[in-house]
Amino acid sequence: MSLMTKHIENEYALYMDGVSVSFDGFKAINNLSLYIKPGEMRAIIGPNGAGKTTMMDIITGKTRPDTGKVLFKNDTDLTKYDEAEVANIGVGRKFQKPSVIESLSVFENIELALKGKRSIWQSLFHALSDQDHQRIQEILELIALQDQQDALAANLSHGQKQWLEIGMLISQEPEVLLIDEPAAGMTDEETMKTAELFKRLAKKHSLVVVEHDMDFIKALDCKVTVLHEGRVLAEGSLETVQANQEVIEVYLGR
């Protein structure tokens, strides 16, 4: 594994280089390279079929690439692991639809997700340590749900459920967060609050955010990567990629 990292001069939380994968002759990912630094937030945009979901599937071990390198922190080859193992290594993934347990409180949802529990349901009957309590309170404050910690998750707004699931995800202490269309279905106010949350998260985690909402991406104020036909079409600030003629033709102008 050390041989794989000899030519990587910089430190990366996530390193994809020359990655390709085909399904029944269709090249879903085509020589894709993506380099995410520790503490970096990156927005990923592109039309339907651009390869955004497949890219995340490859990173998380759901799909094996045909060629290329996929490394975590420069030296861990993620292609050797399945989804559960990749999650334990330190790569967390949040899908578009929230998957909180609505019959439990906000506090209990985060309690269940805390890393190191022997089993999901046993943790409900296992006394929390002072350290556990402190960690849960820190997460509740981070996701701005400390005042709703006793409320049932079912009674939260869509945006609050998204924040709760993000809290559950970070309770497992991932170093890289992959987040799929977080702003979908949110109110304008929730969207802006989510952007602020992500900025706070980026101080301790690397974030890869797949999104269609350009106002949300603008609020993130981060580097943007545009995917098209499974490859990187353009990278830069949102203003830079919006002015790119190729991007206008294949995506933003549609």
Model-derived features with residue positions:
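Catalytic Walker B motif of ABC-type/P-loop ATPase nucleotide-binding domains
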Residues: 177-181
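Conserved ABC nucleotide-binding domain
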Residues: 79-80, 139-155, 160
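ABC ATPase NBD Q-loop/coupling interface
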Residues: 69-88
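The feature captures the beta-strand-to-loop junction immediately N-terminal to the Walker
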Residues: 45-47
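Helix-to-loop junction immediately C-terminal to a conserved catalytic motif
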Residues: 60
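Conserved ABC ATPase "signature" region
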Residues: 123-148, 196
